[in-house]
Amino acid sequence: MMKKYIKSITVLLVILFSVSSVSAATLTQRLADGHKLRLGFGTAVPWAYAGDNGEALGFVNMIALTVLEEMGITEHETKVFEWSGLIPGINADRSDMITGGMYILKSRCENINFSDPIGVFGDAMLVPKGNPKGINNYADVIRTGATLVTGTGFNTVEAAKKFGVPDSQMLLVEGEVGILAAMKAGRADAAVQTFFGAKEHEEKTGGAFEVTDPKLMPKETVNVVGIGFRKSDNEFREAFNAALAKV
């Protein structure tokens, strides 16, 4: 009986050690061992989103896949998260790359590393057609006492606070879907998001909402976008950057 017990414990320890070893391996090592690369992103049209069959769509995913192909990597899996779960997800080993169209911010660099920039983008306000309250930037939100909606974990949360929008005027929801739902329901007077995200909502609603001129936003709201990696995967990140420079 004791021998059987010891054997069971030994098998369990071997399994646990194997799992922890896989988790501790770098992305470069994993791919060499035959594991598929896992792309992590949210639902943020046109940046990154999953198609009907789970395929990675959106222009940031297309850039990432083109670079990976340059590296000789043609197989991957998709992992869809809420935006606020992207960084916790990659650090919990649930994905290998963040391809959601994430701005490179100091606060994010404390938890992950980024590729070289893939583009420069700005934010804008989404408002009801005709912009009845005249909201074009954070100062207008404060001046009018408007309720401003944005996504949990979005760069715009930090930006709104930086420019003085009080918590009492902020509504935080999950992702792009939550933002549009809040605007449709009249729970907010304006939404702040990336210009491309706002344009997508404008088009999706048939003109019920409009996008303000991003040039009326503070210049500090223009940011660069990169692909996110675990800090332990710097070797792979450097190889990705080298391939990015070629495409």
Predicted regions and their residues:
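Extracytoplasmic small-molecule ligand-binding "clamshell" domains
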Residues: A25-G101, E110
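Extended ligand-binding regions for polar small-molecule ligands
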Residues: G58-E70, N131, A139, F154, ...
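A ligand-binding cleft/hinge motif common to bilobed small-molecule-binding domains
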Residues: G85, G101-E110, E158-K162, D189-T221
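Ligand-binding cleft/hinge of the Venus flytrap
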Residues: A50-D52, A64-T74, Y138-A139, F154-E174, ...
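Periplasmic-binding protein-like
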Residues: V120-A124, F195, E203-L244
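Small-molecule pocket liners
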Residues: L37, V45, V120-M125, N131, ...
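Short loop->beta-strand "edge-of-pocket" segments that line small-molecule binding or catalytic clefts
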Residues: H35-T43, L57, Y138-G153
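Acidic, polar ligand-binding/catalytic clefts
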Residues: L65, H76-D140, L216-P218
